[in-house]
Amino acid sequence: MAEELTPENPAIPETPEETEEPIKQRKNGLYPGVSDELAENMQSGWADTELHDLEPIAQAAETAARRAALSARFPGERLVIPAGNLKTRSNDTEYSFRASVEYAYLTGNQTEDGVLVMEPEGDGHAATIYLLPRSDRENGEFWLDGQGELWVGRRHSLAEAGELYGIPASDVRELAGSLREATGPVRVVRGFDAGIEAALTDKVTAERDEELRVFLSEARLVKDEFEIGELQKAVDSTVRGFEDVVKVLDRAEATSERYIEGTFFLRARVEGNDVGYGSICAAGPHACTLHWVRNDGPVRSGDLLLLDAGVETHTYYTADVTRTLPISGTYSELQKKIYDAVYDAQEAGIAAVRPGAKYRDFHDASQRVLAERLVEWGLVEGPVERVLELGLQRRWTLHGTGHMLGMDVHDCAAARVESYVDGTLEPGMVLTVEPGLYFQADDLTVPEEYRGIGVRIEDDILVTADGNRNLSAGLPRRSDEVEEWMAALKG
């Protein structure tokens, strides 16, 4: 990683008249300063690289429709939706940036420091996207600042951004001042841009801002055709990532769970933007830890591998799929018994996903099957109705059986309870169905042979007009089909 050139005492003037923001300084740079001659040289001799007649982003029509729905919900109010800022990982390195879901959902843009402002206009709103313009050649920002274009890449001009996103673009450096002077009702999506929030401190309330956040969460409960297509892309890439993992299990045995994590990550970066969440590559007893993301344990033949992972597309839509695989390629008798119980529970859950059904129905259906098996195996005293009423199965099932899926792996999290978990399924909703059984290594209430076995099966289910469609059906689920699939991949 190259060291920034920014001198501690640059020769380039930094008065307010000559630059709107000071060049970021770096201590311990190797260059003592910038000569006037070099500064002048760097200001000129650059070709015009403005782009013209750009094709709008693929989802431009959808983002416009989403903004129209937002406008209709909050007439006469100024709405401010920030993308967020870069976050420091350590010293002068940053985490990879991911724009706020609310901002990306409404604009399609993923640029740090961006802000969407919806200004009341007539019966609706006029949208403006505020972005940082091209790096300034005059003040040295483009080559001296660690966030300048010669360091991190070319930015779109404001005109280019307007063409791409179908929204007029303005300089974000002018926004905070105009917001401070603005009058009338304002709402802002909180938690992403402290500077924008500070400019609105005396104009907003937490309660009103939460209403904006809730609306934008509930707006995503039903996916449009573009979103469904993106989720299918994410799932298809995820299927290929799972295939990649099976092919290298022998190498993982020689190293650790990290090899599995790295293998899947390669697929995610080659075909998508990233992984949608920290991959869970849990071998052996680690499968009993629901969100095992350390991925530093051994991979042993004879154990199970619980792989919970998803590719995120370039538009931020993520898959969320889990399979529990026999590392040797074949389930033991007990592993198969437990796996088949979870499979039966998932089958019952998926069958309950249909328009008009209660959201909770698929969870209840899955939990009933698992409770029946636990009673049948003598692990908990029946009858089944008693077990379910008291929630006794939860010692081994632990978590809810699914969640909404979209631009967040746990999508629509701010939605009202009555719209989500107490709501009714509609065509276009996408959710996971993911029952599991987890027998902890130190659980003395189960026979010793059960201890350390964890199984989860998870698929991404689209509610359709007449039932449902399993977006991740390309991955085998039944135990015998899993074994056949693994054998074919291993050759």
UniProtKB/Swiss-Prot annotation:
Q: What is its EC number?
A: 3.4.11.9
Q: Which domain of life is it from?
A: Bacteria
User: Which residues does the record give as Mn(2+) 2 binding sites?
Assistant: D308, D320, E458
Kindly name one Pfam family recorded for this protein.
AMP_N
The enzyme's first-digit EC class, named in words, is hydrolase
Residue positions binding Mn(2+) 1: D320, H403, E434, E458
- Give the UniProt entry's GO cellular component terms: cytosol
Q: What is this protein called?
A: Xaa-Pro aminopeptidase 1
